[in-house]
Amino acid sequence: MSDPLFIFYEEPDPDRWFPGDRFPRRVIRRLLRGRPQPGGVMRWFLNLQTGLELAGIPHRVNDYRGLRRTPGAPAHVVGKPHVVTAIPPGHPIIYGPGVAAHPLENDFWGRADLRLILLSCEWFRAMYARDLPVKIPTAVWPAGVDTREWCPPAALPADREILVYDKIRWQRDRLVPELLNPVMAAVAKSGAKVHHLRYGSYREEDYRQLLQRVGAMVFLCEHETQGFAYLQALACGVPVLAWDRGGFWQDPSMYPDRVKFAPVTSVPYFDERCGRKFADTAAFHGIWPQFLSELNSGRYRPRDYVTSHFDLAGQARAYVELCRTALA
């Protein structure tokens, strides 16, 4: 693939009240809210783009005109799903990892010339491979992590501070009193200063600065397909104690009436260098004292895990190789 890659990524932003109103609304949003914060799908795109630049791999972003002028050139649609239908006929598509939560959410299967679907972890790939209405090759590809930006502080924090990262998506009326509140209370009881951060309520820079101050993070999320937030913490040298209940994928828009799939995990990329896991509140109370005692023992080397698996340029090259094989 010596020719430039045509990379596509767009957030849905349809007109709302009259044709073309999305453009002034975009400007007004920027003025009122500031620069948009990247979510997981945007982060896949940004980190792939950075990795391609570091690896010296030429690419063009959202160049529909250039694609049309290059007969048969593949389109690399990182996301989101609506972009698939914007690719002109005659161009094979590599799609992902910014796909819909489940194949049932889209209806372009069998019409678009999809040569490969990239999913960011194995359990997500397995669910897609099982439930796709037509046979399309799938593969696992997670984006790299920018370990230049996400790095440990020059000196370890003097005081013990713990971050509780709250990405509880569903059933909060039950899980906040049954899980989040007991976790917060146990951390506070141990004498640590507790920081509570809820997903979607912060700016990346504030999160990065907070990770310079804490000695560990408790990560609460039903499931993840890559988990940039906890990987960024690991890259900063912060060990993670992760709630990993396993079991079924429980997106309430699909489960249990339309889709049942298991097992899932909240930490698809994790080993003994990263920290520990617990299944429920009782298990947390059992493992929390041990986890605390191990923080200063040198047992955990979370940054080593990230640097050995999520190099930006290395993952960009892996992306190109997967695409090359699929298009051969």
Where are these regions (language model features)?
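Conserved donor-binding/catalytic loop of nucleotide-activated donor transferases
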Residues: 212-214, 232-238, 243
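A charged, aromatic-enriched C-terminal amphipathic alpha-helix characteristic of glycosyltransferases
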Residues: 40-43, 277-324
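Aromatic "clamp/platform" in nucleotide-sugar-dependent glycosyltransferases that forms part
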Residues: 222
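N-terminal pre-catalytic "stem/leader" segment of glycosyltransferase-like enzymes
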Residues: 1-81, 317-322, 327-328
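Extended catalytic core of nucleotide-activated donor transferases of GT-like folds
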Residues: 43-127
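Donor nucleotide-sugar binding/catalytic pocket of nucleotide-sugar-dependent glycosyltransferases
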Residues: 115-126, 134-150
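Conserved catalytic-core segment of nucleotide-activated headgroup transferases in glycan assembly
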Residues: 35, 127, 146-204
